[in-house]
UniProtKB/Swiss-Prot annotation:
UniProt keyword Iron-sulfur present: yes
Residues where ATP binds: S47, P48, T49, G50, T51, G52, K53, T54
Residue ranges of coiled coil: none
Keyword Nucleus: yes
InterPro entries: ATP-dep_Helicase_C (IPR006555), DinG/Rad3-like (IPR045028), DNA/RNA_helicase_DEAH_CS (IPR002464), Helic_SF1/SF2_ATP-bd_DinG/Rad3 (IPR014013), Helicase-like_DEXD_c2 (IPR006554), Helicase_ATP-bd (IPR014001), P-loop_NTPase (IPR027417), RAD3-like_helicase_DEAD (IPR010614)
Domain of life, per lineage: Eukaryota
One Gene Ontology term from the biological process aspect of the record: establishment of sister chromatid cohesion
Catalytic activity, EC: 5.6.2.3
Organism of origin: Debaryomyces hansenii (strain ATCC 36239 / CBS 767 / BCRC 21394 / JCM 1990 / NBRC 0083 / IGC 2968)
Chain sites annotated for binding [4Fe-4S] cluster: C238, C256, C267, C309
Keywords per UniProt: ATP-binding, Cell cycle, DNA-binding, Helicase, Hydrolase, Iron, Iron-sulfur, Isomerase, Metal-binding, Nucleotide-binding, Nucleus, Repeat
Transmembrane segments annotated in the record for this chain: none
Details of cofactor binding: Binds 1 [4Fe-4S] cluster.
Name of this protein: ATP-dependent DNA helicase CHL1
């Protein structure tokens, strides 16, 4: 362990042990985070990408945690049983308990020291591979696709009486407890840090950032390692050679559980109950994982070396862990947290990239299904039933037939309403109407949903149909839909009062949608149980949506908001709202944006800008459709020809498989000495999130219009109605209800703007100019919803900038950069 001479001291002289000399804005951010944790607050933090947000989160939260452990964990931890004992006896007893806990923690650190010095993870000894008896092909073809016998409630034996949704997981968790070792890990601190982000790559980046840090020990006279456990789905951590190759997470989950329940083909990697050798390997896995910071890939390699399942073995160390990194879905779903045995009580919850949190929560608890999808599911179920009807027990046969009946009822409901023209886009569906005039209401949907979850029939049928697809080239589009019907029935069984069923019409397709409209109730359980919840992101503005729709029950004084500036010098950024050119006003609203004269003058204005701007420029359009409209007008008027004479033009493809090549070509063009390029992108497309346009890749960023979502989409119609009804239910007027709905709609748009233009400045020496093309960017209301670091650099407040002034300032800006 290195020397902890930190050069980072906050305004209150608190050490944060930052690995580098922090900037003032980083210290301010760390102070704000520390304060939110210390005072049990909700935190909303905006820190632009490139300002060291992740390290600031790590350093402030870990500093607080180590101080808390030192001051609280190793004090009086138990009360004396007898109230009659003298006070000095009680204190002596409590001190003994605290010292004993501290000694155990110190012993474990020494064990990790020894492991670190004597074990190379790449050379860890492994068990000899077991010889697995291979079934004959015809046996595999039949037996592997048949579920275990299924029994109704009245026939349940002891096996099914205890078979709750998470029973398989809970059983496995008990397997990794193992016998007591000489040196067991210990952590009596009730507080943990849960760091959650959207993608696997973002969580890996967090692991790498965490690896750069070390913190003052909460123990006496001995360094203390950071105890870190990254969690992931089976798709990332399964090491079974066959199951790990399945295409989707649902298939992998069901295949794993199915293999564990099999009496013939159990998984050789699963920790074995009451097996000393297996328990020792699980403990070795856990201990080795704590010798240093490991990411998901490291744990996968370690599991392979030890021939033990990393998905389950990583749980061995959860109790001693200080920081847990996990994807959104694992944190946000109560059923998943229960299955993983994750206790978030009194913990610090950090959600990164939280600008899309409202959408993520809604999408997790939302589902849609079409008539064609139901037809495909029904065909697969019938095909499977005909094949295996003689080999299925009565419970399986009856439930599959009930499921077929249910799918047919749903399909007929959609078809009959479509033909009669009764459907209005976004209209609510009353669930009782679905079964009106049918015998479908006699089917117990709750029991069907139970059957789908317990029997893993979706995986069985998918596996069988996939085998047919591989061997007989039978096209089968419905495989993933079997998991979709499971989710749909769950919503149908337990429709939340915070959500609604409604109609959606897209082209010729009609679907029944269920959408969670109020995410605050789902999120309330996390807020209630955690010590504090911190939402962080590079573009969190406008923040009002979080207070209004995620924390409406939290008093304003309990919510700490902080939006920090950028680390770049003030002179490295300019922002120009542009409202017109050649006496043609720019307003790219839905009813005005196809005006050919405006599109032509837009091209001329952009030509002026690119002639004054070195290197690359990224232009963001509101949609692929509008980008194509503009390109057609520009081609017809030879504007493309004029633009190409100045810079090479690259266009974002709608096909995601082609994005990487376009980006590579754009990048190499800008990095050459003789050429530069223009990249035409789409807000919400592949290039507006997660891709960094630093340095010569984006000396200019141009935003065309305000990218409002489709107000006529079924989702937005349902959401607008919900906001208006909720406002009126709380005593608001109809006028206030309409304003609230409009603000929500506007905020979706402005978050997308902030996310896109935030791609340009990526580090302290970077510089760029942002051009906002639309006269609406001149209004105070829109300008106030820009990210703080963008808003403070607006060249004109409350109005647009004269275009001649824009060109003059652009030329001066880059002239200074070339001279400097």
């Amino acid at each position: 362990m290195g020397n902890l001479e930190a050069n980072d001291v906050g305004n209150n002289s608190r050490k944060y042990n930052h690995p580098f000399e922090p900037y003032d804005i980083q210290i301010q951010l760390m102070d704000a985070i520390y304060d939110a944790i210390d005072n049990y607050k909700i935190g909303l933090f905006e820190s632009p990408t490139g300002t060291g947000k992740t390290l600031s989160l790590i350093c402030s939260s870990m500093t607080w945690l180590r101080e808390y452990k030192k001051n609280s964990t190793f004090r009086e931890t138990e009360d004396s049983e007898s109230e009659d004992e003298p006070e000095w006896v009680k204190q002596a007893y409590q001190k003994t308990i605290a010292n004993r806990t501290k000694v155990r923690a110190q012993e474990y650190e020494r064990l990790l020291d020894d492991l670190s010095e004597n074990y190379d993870v790449s050379k860890v000894s492994v068990l000899p591979e077991k010889k697995v008896k291979r079934q004959k092909p015809e046996q595999e073809q039949d037996e592997n696709f048949i579920p275990a016998d299924y029994y109704s409630d009245s026939e349940l034996d002891s096996k099914y009486e205890n078979d709750k949704l998470t029973s398989e997981i809970n059983e496995l968790l008990s397997r990794v407890d193992g016998p007591k070792e000489t040196v067991e890990p210990v952590n009596d601190c009730p507080v943990k840090i849960f760091f959650s982000s959207r993608t696997h790559s973002q969580l890996s980046q967090f692991s790498h950032q965490l690896n750069m840090t070390e913190f003052e020990s909460s123990l006496d006279n001995i360094p203390e390692r950071i105890k870190f456990s990254p969690l992931a789905s089976r798709k990332q951590l399964c090491i079974h050679p066959k199951i790990s190759k399945l295409s989707n997470v649902s298939s992998i989950n069901d295949a794993c559980i199915d293999l564990q329940q099999s009496s013939k083909n159990s998984c050789e990697y699963i920790p074995k109950l009451h097996n000393t050798q297996s328990e020792e390997i699980v403990k070795k896995f856990s201990d080795l994982s704590f010798t240093k910071i490991h990411d998901i890939e490291d744990l996968g390699k370690l599991g392979n070396k030890l021939k033990i399942c990393p998905y389950y073995s990583v749980r061995k160390g959860i109790d001693v862990t200080e920081i847990i990194a996990l994807p959104y879905q694992m944190l946000l779903q109560d059923s998943t947290r229960s299955a993983l045995n994750l206790n978030i009580d009194d913990s610090i919850i950090i959600i990164d990239e939280a600008h899309n949190l409202l959408d993520v929560i809604s999408s997790i608890y939302s589902v849609s299904i079409t008539s064609n999808e139901l037809s495909d599911i029904t065909k697969s179920l019938k095909f499977y039933l005909n094949k295996f009807i003689k080999r299925l027990n009565s419970g399986n046969r009856i439930n599959i037939m009930k499921l077929i009946k249910l799918c047919q009822v749903l399909e007929k409901f959609i078809s009959s309403n479509s033909k009669d023209g009764k459907i209005k886009h976004g209209d609510e569906i009353i669930t009782s109407d679905i079964f009106e005039g049918t015998t479908g209401d006699l089917v117990n949907i709750h029991k069907i949903e139970q059957f789908l979850n317990k029997s893993k029939i979706a995986y069985k049928i998918e596996s069988y149909m996939q085998k047919l697809n591989d061997s007989e080239s039978i096209k089968n589009r419905s495989n993933p839909l079997l998991f979709k019907i499971t989710k749909f029935l769950k919503c149908l069984t337990n429709p939340s009062k915070e959500g609604k069923f409604f109609w959606d019409k897209t082209n010729d397709s009609v679907s029944i949608n269920y959408m969670l409209l109020d995410p605050s109730e789902i999120f309330r359980d996390i807020v209630k149980r955690a010590r504090c919840v911190l939402l962080c992101g590079g573009t969190m503005e406008p923040m009002n949506d979080y207070t209004n729709y995620l924390f409406p029950y939290i008093p304003p004084e309990q919510i700490k908001k902080f939006s920090c500036g950028h680390i770049i010098p003030q002179e490295n950024l300019e922002v120009f709202p542009i409202g017109n050119y050649n006496d043609i006003s720019f307003e790219f609203s839905f009813d005005k944006r196809n005006n050919s004269k405006m599109i032509i003058e837009l091209g001329h204005a952009i030509l002026n800008i690119i002639e004054s701007t070195p290197d690359g420029i990224v232009i963001f359009f509101p949609s692929y459709k509008y980008l194509n409209v503009v390109m057609n007008v520009w081609r017809q008027n030879k504007i493309i020809e004029s633009l190409t004479k100045v810079k090479a033009i690259f266009q974002e493809p709608e096909d995601s498989s082609k994005v990487e090549k376009v980006l590579n070509d754009y990048s190499s063009t800008n990095k050459s000495e003789k050429h530069s390029a223009l990249l035409l992108s789409v807000v919400g497309g592949k290039m507006s999130e997660g891709i960094n346009f630093s340095d010569e890749l984006a000396r200019g960023v141009i935003m065309i219009g305000l990218p409002f979502p489709n107000i006529f989409s079924a989702e937005l119609i349902a959401k607008r109605k919900f906001i208006e009804e909720s406002t009126i239910a709380k005593g608001g007027t109809k006028s206030q209800a309409m304003v609230n709905a409009k603000n929500f709609y506007e905020n979706i748009c402005m978050r997308a703007v902030n996310q896109s233009i935030g791609r340009s400045i990526r580090h302290k020496n970077d510089y760029s100019i942002i051009y906002l093309f639309d006269q609406r960017y001149g209004s105070d209301k829109i300008q106030d919803k820009l990210s703080g670091w963008v808003k403070q650099k607006l060249f004109t407040r409350g109005r647009c900038t004269d275009f001649n002034q824009v060109i003059k300032e652009t030329q001066d800006f880059f002239r200074q950069k070339l001279l400097g």
